[in-house]
Amino acid sequence: MLKAEEVKLFIAGRDVYSFDPETKEFAAMIHYGLDGNCLVRFAAGGTDSGVYGFEGDSYWTRYETFRNGERHRFDLQPLGLGIAQAYFADGTIAFLQAHSMDLTALSKG
């Protein structure tokens, strides 16, 4: 798993593209502002705003309505350059995360 500083570099101030981990279908793009605010733009349309932060080697998010407005913590497993698999704190697989829409680095991991 990525360590605290690596998680911050992967998330803070970036646009992160989220994909279904099985189908690799684009699901959403999340902008993580340097001020702790985030905005998700869903592939199916619509947006939701929220906040995010860091806790140990993890990061957390809480949106107004997405995921029932609840706070969720995630760990990141690196899979390739600019690509990581997110896991909920309980170990359940979450979105595949990437710094671009291009997932070709997965085949080089």
How would you describe each model-predicted region?
Residues 1-51, 60-109:
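Lipid interaction determinants
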Residues 54-56:
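Cysteine-nucleophile amide-bond enzymes
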